[in-house]
Curated annotation (Swiss-Prot):
Tissues with expression: Ubiquitous.
Domain comment quoted from the record: The PHD-type zinc finger mediates interaction with SCE1, GTE3 and GTE5 and is required for E3 activity.
Glycyl lysine isopeptide (Lys-Gly) (interchain with G-Cter in SUMO) cross-link, renumbered residues: K100, K488
Protein name per UniProt: E3 SUMO-protein ligase SIZ1
Subunit structure: Interacts (via PHD domain) with SCE1, GTE3 and GTE5.
Length: 884
């Protein structure tokens, strides 16, 4: 096997990287396809003349080339093609090798040398055309020229195109079919001594064959004369010299439309005149002269005209010229600021202040909205133009220049913008006046609108779209898709929340107050823990939270043991929270009646002078129940056992059942009275130590009608009267958290000023010492645990009773005394006194309730505490006055 065949076999295993490494060592060009690189190496082995041409200054022998190929191949075998013969690792010295004397072979046609000077011989410095279909070699000194003759040799450009390739790109509407006259360089004929312009001229002949003449018979074929400045800053355009004089077969032809002495600007373009009418079959003569010192080349070509659609077909389709990801990255970079220059000195106001950026989709060429978004690929901005309009205008102007940045390119750089073209495609059915969109830094967009009517007309286009054109989820959709977390609602109902009182019926049918659970087993204690050390009190406020402010959230103050629901029929119940449920049968039909002998002394400290004093009606006079508090009752006797379901207690839906079992009482249960005694008065608060016979012995002739649902399973005798409801003591020395009538974990102690007005003032030391001498109750309750407020006397007018003087009323006296139920009426009215409505409150209209008193205006200033303290004194006088 000879040397050339051996190297050819080894080169077949080389990759492009290895081939370029070998060519680098040989000093040859590395551009081209793989087969071209292989042929370039094999040429050095087969043809000495071509080797001398390719290697330029260095001459290499066949043996040196073969050794270089062999070393590279051996390294590929050893290292698995990972360590390549590159970066000076080849030890062969190719710089000092000389070509051995061998007979010269004819020049191979693969090595094309075509220069404007007309010389096809190689020189020491040559440059190759970048066009893959051309790859001709030209002399550097002939085509790379300085701007001024005295500037010296300019550096080689990064990319080089020969004059033929530049001409093809200058006007894509003309397709070159043949070159009857190859490019020739104009030469200076005279050099004036007076500094005038140098005259240059060239005269050539070209031949038009019969086949060319047949083509010219078709309307789309023509013969065109062209001229080009070799060192033009705008590569892809024609330019004629100053004072150009063109003649074809002796016929003058106008070459330019500008004045002869005017230079062509950067944005200007010259056209190539059509000389078809001036030529004839056979040999034709053409000459060109001009007064210009610059170097031009001149030629004649046979061309075919392209249609507009054919030129548009040259532009790659959407997504092929540029990927969508690259286009989106450019838009984000431009919207984010900097205009594509990622330098630290970029000072973009858009990046600082704008949430989105307005983009106008009007074509800068036509002024109408862009239909097909086109742009030049090398441009760093995001501006676009209408592709169809742009190409059509360039059919005459031949100015392939970006209308935004004014940089010059060729038709091969035009692409369809994949980002903006999706937007314009969605807007094709919009009105032509809709031309603006808003783009966010992430690339999402929407059509800009100024009025609500425009938004409705745009429809979905007025909403934010993702960069790919899909709709972005709106805030409503996001809210709908949010995960709904389960919320545990304890003691809450959809309607008005009920007031829950810590009372229940014992085995004897007596209503009793829940004692503090010292062992921590009650439901409220399990929820409250041990952070609160003060008592629960009854708020004299319409606030649900005990804060003293009307309209608080009714969802709080719901954690009581049981429910005690009242219906006020539109009247404001100052002594009960807003959490009143109207679903239970506790009507308050406060009707106006004669005042009788009940007289109420009102001391008001409020700012209003028109406080109304409502005289109590005979609610319970004559054993009537219309104005009282009605509890429906079942027949006497305990029919059903008490509901011991702890879940019903904790849930707040067990009616008046307040205790899981009897263990929640610290005192023995009292016996149910066998008959219904008449109550001498109403005991709202009790501090007597003796409650063994019943917590309160106050009854009424009318039945207490409580439904089984409210009683929690207990029933009472029809003749059993309304019993007074004891309230928790006001002592602050106790440490239990739920020692209150109202089992509300949020209203502890005396934190809320609105609660102060319904509590007795704290007794002084002398008053307290009087209570210390009293004996403790036999059932384990201390006398300090109960406080009494006397709300009037019996019908017999017994004001001199010692038990009522100091507010202490024994159970024996209560069980034996006879009287009317006026005090019960007064207490029920006190509990159920509400204003008719919010509108009636504004008009200062009060219900006919015996103990409904004017409320002061609540304010947020520092006088609230003093005002409520004065109101406390007023209430005490009202309650203690009774009936005189």
């Amino acid at each position: 096997m000879d040397l050339e065949a051996n190297c050819k076999e080894k080169l077949s295993y080389f990759r492009i990287k290895e081939l370029k490494d070998v060519l680098t060592q040989l000093g040859l060009s590395k551009q081209g396809k793989k087969q071209e690189l292989v042929d370039r190496i094999l040429t050095l082995l087969s043809d000495e003349q071509a080797a001398r041409l390719l290697s330029k200054k260095n001459t290499v022998a066949k043996e040196a080339v073969a050794k270089l190929v062999d070393d590279t191949y051996r390294k590929m075998q050893v290292s698995g093609a990972s360590d390549l013969a590159s970066k000076g690792q080849v030890s062969s010295d190719t710089s000092n090798l000389k070509v051995k004397g061998e007979p010269e072979d004819p020049f191979q046609p693969e090595i094309k040398v075509r220069c404007v000077c007309g010389n096809s011989l190689e020189t020491d410095s040559m440059i190759q055309c970048e066009d893959p279909r051309c790859h001709v070699w030209q002399h550097v000194g002939c085509v790379i020229l300085p701007d001024k003759p005295m500037d010296g040799n300019p550096p080689l450009p990064e990319s080089f195109y020969c004059e033929i390739c530049r001409l093809t790109r200058a006007d894509p509407f003309w397709v070159t079919v043949a070159h009857p006259l190859s490019p020739v360089r104009l030469t200076a004929t005279t050099i004036p001594n007076d500094g005038a312009s140098t005259m240059q001229s060239v005269e050539r002949t070209f031949q038009i064959t019969r086949a060319d003449k047949d083509l010219l018979a078709k309307p789309e074929y023509d013969v065109q004369a062209w001229c080009m400045l070799l060192n033009d800053k705008v590569l892809f355009r024609m330019q004629w010299p100053q004072y150009a004089d063109l003649q074809v077969n002796g016929v003058p032809v106008r070459a330019i439309n500008r004045p002869g002495g005017q230079l062509l600007g950067v944005n200007g373009r010259d056209d190539g005149p059509i000389i078809t009418s001036c030529i004839r079959d056979g040999v034709n003569r053409i000459s060109l002269s001009g007064g210009d010192v610059r170097i031009f080349c001149f030629g004649v070509r046979l061309v075919k005209r392209r249609t507009l659609q054919q030129v548009l077909n040259l532009i790659p389709e959407e997504g092929k010229g540029e990927t969508f990801e690259d286009a989106l990255a450019r838009v984000r970079r431009c919207i984010g600021g900097g205009g594509g220059d990622d330098n630290a000195d970029s000072d973009s106001d858009i990046e600082v202040v704008a949430d989105f950026f307005g983009v106008n989709l009007r074509c800068p060429m036509s002024g109408s909205r862009i239909k097909v978004a086109g742009r030049f690929l090398p441009c760093v901005h995001m501006g676009c133009f209408d592709l169809d309009v742009f190409v059509e205008l360039n059919q005459r102007s031949r100015k392939w220049q970006c209308p935004i940045c004014l940089k010059n390119y060729s038709v091969e750089h035009v692409i369809v913008d994949p980002y903006f073209n999706r937007i314009t495609s969605k807007m094709k059915h919009c009105d032509e006046e809709v031309t603006e969109i808003e783009v966010k830094p992430d690339g999402s967009w929407r059509v800009k609108f100024k009025r609500e009517s425009e938004r409705r007309e745009l429809g979905e286009l007025s909403q934010w779209h993702a960069p790919d054109g899909s709709l972005c989820p709106s805030a409503v959709d996001i809210k709908r898709k949010m995960e709904m977390l389960p919320v545990k609602q304890e003691g809450y109902s959809d309607g008005p929340a009920p007031l829950k009182l810590g009372i229940r019926k014992n085995r004897n049918g007596i209503w009793e107050v829940s004692k503090p659970n010292t062992n921590g087993l009650s439901s409220s204690n399990r929820q409250e823990k041990v952070g609160y050390q003060e008592k629960n009190i009854i708020p004299m406020s319409s606030s649900a939270t005990g804060s003293g402010r009307d309209g608080d959230d009714a969802s709080v103050n719901q954690d009581a043991i049981g429910t005690f629901d009242f219906v006020a029929n539109g009247m404001e119940l100052d002594s009960i929270s807003m959490n009143v449920d109207s679903g239970y049968n506790f009507p308050d039909r406060n009707q106006s009646g004669e005042g009788g002998n009940n007289e109420v002394i009102v001391l008001s400290d409020s700012d209003d002078e028109n406080d109304l004093v409502i005289t109590p009606g005979p609610a319970y006079s004559g054993c009537q129940t219309d104005g009282g508090l009605t509890f429906p009752l079942n027949p006497p006797g305990i029919i059903n056992s008490y509901n011991e379901d702890p879940h019903s207690i904790a849930g707040g839906s067990s009616g008046l059942g307040l205790f899981n079992d009897d263990d929640e009482f610290d005192t023995p249960l009292w016996s149910f009275p066998s008959e219904t005694p008449e109550a001498p008065g109403f005991q709202l608060f009790r501090s007597d130590a003796d409650v063994s016979g019943g917590l309160v012995g106050l009854h009424h002739h009318s039945p207490l009608n409580c439904s089984p649902e409210i009683n929690g399973g207990y029933t009472m005798a029809p003749e059993t009267s309304m019993a007074s409801v004891p309230v928790v003591p006001g002592s602050t020395g106790r440490s239990e958290a739920n020692d209150g009538l109202v089992d509300n974990p949020l209203a502890f102690g005396r934190d809320d000023p609105s609660l102060q007005i319904f509590l007795p003032t704290k007794p002084d030391a002398s008053a307290q010492s009087g209570f210390k001498n009293q004996a403790d109750m036999s059932n384990g309750l201390r006398s300090e645990d109960w406080i009494s407020l006397r709300l009037g006397d019996s019908a017999s007018g017994n004001h001199g009773d010692p038990a009522t003087t100091n507010g202490i009323n024994s159970s024996h006296q209560m069980s034996t005394r006879e009287g009317s139920m006026d005090t019960t009426t007064e207490t029920a009215s006190l509990l159920l006194g509400m204003n008719d409505s919010r509108q009636d409150k504004a008009k200062k209209q009060r219900s006919d309730n015996p103990f409904s008193f004017p409320r002061q205006k609540r304010s947020n200033n520092e006088q609230d505490h003093q005002t409520r303290h004065r109101s406390l004194n007023k209430i005490c006088i009202i309650l203690c006055a009774g009936k005189n």
